[in-house]
Amino acid sequence: MKVVLQRVSEASVDVVNELGTLDPTFEPQQIGPGFMILVGVTDEDGDKQIAWLAHKILNLRVFEDAQGKMNRSIQDIGGEILSISQFTLFADVHKGNRPSFIKAGKPEHADFMWIKFDEALRSGGVPVKEGRFGAHMRVGLVNDGPVTIVIDTEHDMPDGTR
């Protein structure tokens, strides 16, 4: 799994239909202070990756304390998460100018894992709002910092836990 995490003061998502207008079947989602995360899944990802990544995000100390040091977690500040499924995080651009997405998980698996991952985040007591899997979305956010961190379970998880 791969996540691009951005610390935000606010973020929102709308779904766009095939006509290029807002999809009336999707209720726009918005959050206040917290994280906007783009989540990519591979076919090799499973429960171990979900558990490790959710724990890492819930406990990541990237919010300032009273002294201005990044010393507080999203749980500490009572923040929220906006989670967006994003298969393009696994783009391969080695050949030519057109990205290949062969490393991205198959849609059925990726959707299931993304939902399960968001549930793991919620179990940590943090409200999680979501986009719609596979949809064309418009995501808006106000970066706070900016603080942007890429977490990749393939490279960042300790060897014994993969």
Swiss-Prot record:
It is found in: Cytoplasm. It comes from the Bacteria. InterPro entries: Daa-tRNA_deacyls_DTD, DTD-like_sf. One of its GO terms (molecular function) is Gly-tRNA(Ala) deacylase activity. One of its GO terms (biological process) is D-amino acid catabolic process. A motif (Gly-cisPro motif, important for rejection of L-amino acids) lies at residues 145-146. Keywords: Cytoplasm, Hydrolase, RNA-binding, tRNA-binding. It catalyses: glycyl-tRNA(Ala) + H2O = tRNA(Ala) + glycine + H(+); a D-aminoacyl-tRNA + H2O = a tRNA + a D-alpha-amino acid + H(+). The keyword Repeat does not apply. Its EC number is 3.1.1.96. GO terms for cellular component: cytoplasm. It holds the Pfam family Tyr_Deacylase. Homodimer. A Gly-cisPro motif from one monomer fits into the active site of the other monomer to allow specific chiral rejection of L-amino acids. Belongs to the DTD family. An aminoacyl-tRNA editing enzyme that deacylates mischarged D-aminoacyl-tRNAs. Also deacylates mischarged glycyl-tRNA(Ala), protecting cells against glycine mischarging by AlaRS. Acts via tRNA-based rather than protein-based catalysis; rejects L-amino acids rather than detecting D-amino acids in the active site. By recycling D-aminoacyl-tRNA to D-amino acids and free tRNA molecules, this enzyme counteracts the toxicity associated with the formation of D-aminoacyl-tRNA entities in vivo and helps enforce protein L-homochirality. This is D-aminoacyl-tRNA deacylase.
